[in-house]
C-alpha cells in the first residue's frame, strides 16, 4: 500500500542529500520489517548535472545502519567512517532518468544525490510503499498511514466521473 508520497523539487544551487536509508527513519515510525520500497518518477530529466539519484549498489543487504545527525542541519546519514568503508566495497551508480522514467529501490538501499549545478529546477515524484503485514505498530506524528483494506469498486467509471477530478497539471 502507499505509505508515503511527496513531490521533490530541487532548485538550482540546491545541495544534494547525504547517503541514507529510508528504512532507518521508517523503523522509528513503527515499521518492524524493512519490507518497504520507494519509486522515483522523473517529471524533469534527472542528470548528473542537476543532482540525480545515486545509489550504492547492493547495500540493501547490509541491514539497517545507524545514522548520525549532520552538524548545523536537520539532515542525517550513515556515519562517515563506516560510509568510507562501504564505498570501497559497493559501487556508486548514478541513476539518470528521462522524463517519465522511474526507478524502484529497497528501503535499506543507501542512496543520496549530488548538488543541482544546473540553471533549472528538477522535479520528481516519490512514492513509498509498505506491505500490509508491516503496518506500523504504533502511531507517529509523521502522518504515514496504517494499512487499511480497500473495497473493490463495483461501478464502472464513466466520463462524468472524470470531469469532477481537479486539474493536477504542474506549471512552473
What are these regions (language model features)?
Residues 1-55:
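Conserved double-stranded beta-helix
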Residues 102-104, 108-172:
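Non-heme Fe(II)/2-oxoglutarate
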Residues 11, 47, 62, 131-133:
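Feature marks short, surface-exposed loop/turn motifs that line or immediately flank catalytic pockets
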Residues 21-24, 77-89, 121, 140-146:
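Short, surface-exposed loop/helix-turn segments at secondary-structure junctions
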Residues 18, 38-42, 92-94, 102-104, ...:
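Conserved hydrophobic/aromatic beta-strand scaffold that supports enzyme active sites
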Amino acid at each position: 500500500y502507499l505509505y508515503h508520497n511527496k513531490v521533490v523539487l530541487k532548485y538550482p544551487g540546491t545541495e544534494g542529500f547525504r547517503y541514507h536509508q529510508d528504512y532507518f527513519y521508517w523503523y522509528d515510525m513503527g515499521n518492524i520489517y524493512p519490507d518497504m520500497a520507494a519509486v522515483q518518477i522523473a517529471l524533469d530529466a534527472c542528470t548528473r548535472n542537476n543532482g540525480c539519484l545515486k545509489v550504492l549498489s547492493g547495500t540493501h543487504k547490509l541491514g539497517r545502519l545507524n545514522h548520525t545527525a549532520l552538524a548545523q542541519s536537520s539532515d542525517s546519514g550513515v556515519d562517515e567512517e563506516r560510509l568510507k568503508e562501504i564505498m570501497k566495497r559497493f559501487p556508486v551508480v548514478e541513476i539518470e532518468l528521462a522524463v517519465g522514467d522511474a526507478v524502484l529501490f529497497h528501503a535499506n538501499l543507501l542512496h543520496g544525490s549530488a548538488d543541482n549545478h544546473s540553471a533549472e529546477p528538477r522535479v520528481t515524484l516519490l512514492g513509498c510503499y509498505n506491505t500490509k503485514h508491516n503496518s506500523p505498530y504504533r502511531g507517529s506524528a509523521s502522518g504515514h498511514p496504517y494499512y487499511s483494506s480497500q473495497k473493490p469498486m463495483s461501478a464502472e467509471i464513466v466520463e462524468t466521473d472524470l470531469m469532477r477530478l481537479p486539474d493536477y497539471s504542474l506549471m512552473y
